[in-house]
């Protein structure tokens, strides 16, 4: 079996276990609309919103979440339970699928995520989406994709380099929530087993084994494209996540441009080692606290961005 397939299988097993563990935390008062087709063959999205609005036309601040999976795996179903939990707190939460590597190459997922925003703009009234109050979010590879899309929305030259005509205006993006992503490949330690996995992932996504001289790698590394127009950010990673330095670095870069950053990080000697994607562990106190921090941040941003204020709970 190819290494990429092994990575995909490992992510799938972990995601299934994680989703099963999250089920007990999912509220009953959430309505789901699944598998809406927003574009090409792999372009489907799920929408979750509070059931109390099933028969009304209330528009809610919307969280557009892009799943992880190292660009070669993952599915919107992996984050569905977490999105249902967020929807139960007064939001419309959307999980999107995108085409995976090696079948789809960079920057196809970023382009598809932009298409999803176009779809949500067009059908906002039917899906309880307030298009004036959108949040981009993602975990792992999805965080990287979300960060690139956020940068493209606010920077026309960056959007042009990606081949994107942004589907939304900068003012529509209230913020971006990024968990355990990659934001500057040049700063990742490629030694050991993790380095070998990274090389396989990059090879699959970019279509060439050695991408060190590929100008697209600098484009991919969104930390180099942050400007003062970048949306306010919520950023977190676990202390035992090998990608945690990436989150710290991008938080510093965003803040250096005068943009508000809310971060949840943990010291290296923290009493518990928190792994990649720790935020989905709601059986643990740290995952629960981060969910509360995220919800508070979302509420504050939603209140600042819309006349209807924060969601009612």
Q: Where do the protein language model's features map onto the residues?
A:
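Alpha/beta-hydrolase superfamily serine-hydrolase fold, recognizing
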Residues: 1-313
